[in-house]
Swiss-Prot record:
Lineage of source species: Bacteria, Bacillati, Cyanobacteriota, Cyanophyceae, Synechococcales
Cofactor note: Binds 1 heme b (iron(II)-protoporphyrin IX) group per dimer.
Transmembrane segments: none
GO biological process, one term: response to oxidative stress
InterPro entries: Catalase_peroxidase, Haem_peroxidase, Haem_peroxidase_sf, Peroxidases_AS
Protein name in UniProt: Catalase-peroxidase
Gene it is expressed from: katG
Protein family (similarity comment): Belongs to the peroxidase family. Peroxidase/catalase subfamily.
GO MF term set: catalase activity; heme binding; metal ion binding
Length: 754
């Protein structure tokens, strides 16, 4: 939980973001508000769009984000190459200088911006959740709604404005995503912590993400019972990792604003686990985050203006204008809680645990009316000084989440060790901070810069380096051995697909590299059909063992899928080359944190026409979810579905959607028959349909909703019609191979990106 935590804001403090702009008098030549100029025909506010008219329509927008039309950078711009030209040492020096270069428009507490910068970085990284890999700091998304206007992010707009001169100076070589995390890390370094390291590589996006589900609430900080299915505080709705809308983790005043440290401890444990933190890391991050900086609540709610997205144009993207006195310094308003945690809030020390363990604590209200814990008795010299006048001292504070660190038995035991062993605490925190700020950056192969730690950490999903090469002749020889092994096209394609489909473009985890499909837990996932998988792996392992030179099983799995596809295309009369680039390694079980891979388990896969069970979300929506996480477009999704069906890759060998009499041949039959008006569809059970001859009624095929959506949705049908055309049979094969290759290489960060 970050310093100066703004996660406890109530609606009484910061209202729901409406349009706060007041009506301005019109000039004589202005059109009255009740009229709309003819030239304003664009739907510029998002009102009355198609989804307003048909709210249940399938929304394909999540597949069409972050394209060239929204990106101001030149074609061919490569951020990784640009970052490698950055003078990182100079940036770090500038950040160290910034920490104590207080600006009159937003003065630094005690003359040091460290606490503010840490909170900014924390709240950027802290949105990450392991369930779907979304959120986090790797895209610089804190610049955009809703995050730039969350109640928990009050006044972080000022932190980013303070960084603007540095961003402006280093330009394209330094993304906002990298700068935000580096600023937080340098803040700790400037206050005395020996940091673990820093890696660049966060490439900025240029508009808000459309795919991230932040919750169903329509009100900031709505009661947390919206997110829990029962009284059990472990039942937080998946994939969410915050207890209320607009918070990063927990409400530090207590559950729904009601102080109870033991109840809050349950929320802390659940939310931190949702981002893959264990109990020791949780205590370290909580304590380390609150060793420096302060909370701000020395104002009244009615004096605070709207958030950035609701503020007037003259605010220029800033929000929460404070009309209380100067509105800054000791009168700053952020979370509603008021005070610092430690005696020396601008230096790294063990003061947090000293405060917790050496005082009794009682509940009080801040000037803004927020619950906070204050010491019953405290020596004057142990109190932190005022942010403006060092001759004035104030009581330190603790949030309900801080009290959980000594009230929860497990947390208390960890806290006691950290108190006894400050060096150990600093070491654990430094590594936990690195994990927090790099968890969504992907494997170590994506890390950039001279400060990357040498140590391999298990949460980075390490893969051994590859020390072999394969010639074209050797690749051909391996293909021939695989095709002559007795394995079918379906078996080879299914195994390669299952190995690669775990890739998530959100946090760059999963994929075929590493061949973790042969390890726990993946080898026993029902979606991977363990019996079929074991059969295929045994054959490929035999080929691997008897080949004349080293080759990874990861490469053989992908090569086998590609060889099978080339054969299936040739059986249909089309010769095609399925690109294959060796270089994948084989991870070991010791390199694999089995528990951390559980969220990657496919419990649905429309590409293989499979659901582990019935879900409240429709099958076609689940298909979009998987497609978006895999980084695929709607046309790529369409061509892959059509190809996978005719190749006979359905889970369990079902025939739903297999609209062909030539199973195993890569053809466009799926689209030809789907769009043929000689057939008529009718329901035949739960998520099942029959296609029959329109004249005789004879049943020809069966299908699921995932199959039929490519004929019913107007956008998807337009793609299906392209691939059904007589002149696009070869195009279908080419496009299928291109999309397939993209999936197989999604986690090959060693390859050039084009």
């Amino acid at each position: 939980m970050g310093t100066q935590p703004a996660r406890k804001l109530r609606n009484r403090v910061f209202p729901h973001p409406h349009n706060h702009r007041k009506e301005k008098p019109m000039a004589n030549d202005q059109v009255p508000a009740s009229k709309c100029p003819v030239m304003h025909g664009a739907n510029t506010t998002g009102q009355n769009g198609n989804l307003n008219w048909w709210p249940n329509a399938l929304n394909l927008d999540i597949l069409h984000q972050h394209d060239r039309k929204t990106n101001p950078m030149d074609d061919g711009f490569n951020y990784a190459e640009a970052f490698q030209q950055l003078d990182l040492a100079a940036v770090k020096q500038d950040l160290h200088h910034l920490m104590t270069d207080s600006q009159s428009w937003w003065p630094a507490d005690w003359g040091h911006y460290g606490g503010l910068m840490i909170r900014m970085a924390w709240h950027a990284a802290g949105t990450y959740r392991i369930a779907d890999g979304r959120g986090g700091a790797a895209t610089g998304n804190q610049r955009f709604a809703p995050l730039n206007s969350w109640p928990d992010n009050v006044n972080l707009d000022k932190a980013r404005r303070l960084l603007w001169p540095i961003k402006k100076k280093y330009g394209n070589k330094l993304s906002w995503g990298d700068l935000i995390i580096l600023a937080g890390t340098m803040a700790y370094e400037s206050m005395g912590l020996k940091v673990y390291g820093f890696a660049g590589g966060r490439e900025d996006i240029w508009h808000p993400e459309k795919d991230i589900y932040w919750g169903a609430e329509k009100e900031w900080l709505a009661s947390s019972d919206h997110r829990y299915g029962s009284e059990d505080r472990e039942s937080l709705e998946n994939p969410l990792a915050a207890v209320q809308m607009g918070l990063i983790y927990v409400n530090p005043e207590g559950v729904d604003g009601h102080p109870d440290p033991l109840c809050t401890a349950q929320d802390v444990r659940t939310t931190f686990a949702r981002m893959a933190m264990n109990d020791e890391e949780t205590v370290a991050l909580t304590a380390g985050g609150h060793t420096v900086g302060k909370c701000h609540g020395n104002s009244k709610a009615e004096l605070i203006g709207p958030e950035p997205e609701g503020a007037d144009v003259v605010e220029q993207g800033l929000g929460w204008h404070n009309q209380n006195g100067k509105g800054v310094g000791r009168e700053t308003m952020s979370s509603g809680i008021e005070g610092a945690w430690t005696t020396h809030p601008t230096q790294w020390d063990n003061g947090y645990f000293y405060m917790l363990f050496n005082h009794e604590w009682e509940l009080k209200k801040s000037p803004a009316g927020a619950w906070q814990w204050e010491p019953v008795n405290i020596k004057e010299e142990d109190k932190p000084v005022d942010v403006e006048d060092p001759n004035i001292r104030h009581n330190p504070i603790m949030t309900d989440a801080d009290m959980a660190m000594i009230k929860d038995p497990i947390y208390r035991q960890i806290s006691e060790r950290f108190y006894r062993e400050p060096d150990y605490f600093a070491e654990v925190f430094a590594k936990a901070w690195f994990k927090l700020t790099h968890r969504d950056l992907g494997p170590k192969s994506r890390y950039l810069g001279p400060d990357v730690p040498q140590e391999d950490l298990i949460w980075q999903d390490p893969i051994p380096p590859v020390d072999y090469t394969l010639s074209e002749g050797e690749i051909k020889e391996l293909e021939q051995q695989i095709l002559a092994s007795g394995l079918t096209v379906s078996e080879l394609v299914c195994t390669a697909w299952d190995s690669a489909r775990t890739f998530r473009s959100s946090d760059y985890r999963g994929g075929a590299n590493g061949a973790r499909i042969r390890l726990e837990p993946q080898k026993n996932w029902p979606g991977n059909e363990p019996t079929r998988l074991a059969k295929v792996l045994a054959v490929l392992e035999n080929i691997q063992a008897n080949f004349a030179k080293p080759v990874s099983l990861a490469d053989l799995i992908v090569l086998g899928g590609g060889a099978a596809i080339a054969k299936a295309a040739l059986d249909g009369g089309i010769e095609v080359n399925v690109p294959f680039l060796p270089g994948r390694g084989d991870a070991t079980q010791a390199m694999t944190d089995a528990e951390s891979f559980t969220p990657l388990e496919p419990i649905h896969d429309g590409y293989r026409n499979w659901l582990k069970q019935d879900y409240a979300v429709s099958p076609e929506e689940l298909l979009l979810e998987r497609t978006q996480l895999m980084g695929l477009t709607a046309p790529e999704m369409t061509v892959l579905i059509g190809g996978m069906r005719v190749l006979g890759t359905n889970h369990g060998g079902t025939k739903h959607g297999v609209f062909t009499d030539r199973v195993g041949v890569l053809s466009n039959d799926f689209f030809v028959n789907l769009t043929d008006m000689a057939y008529q569809w009718r329901p035949a059970g739960n998520n099942l349909y029959e296609i029959g001859d329109r004249q005789t009624g004879e049943v020809k095929w069966t299908a699921t909703k995932v199959d039929l959506v490519f004929g019913s949705n107007s956008i998807l049908r337009s793609y299906a019609e392209v691939y059904a055309q007589d002149d696009n049979r070869e195009k279908f094969v080419r496009d299928f191979v291109a999309a397939w290759t993209k999936v197989m290489n999604a986690d090959r960060f060693d390859l050039p990106r084009g």
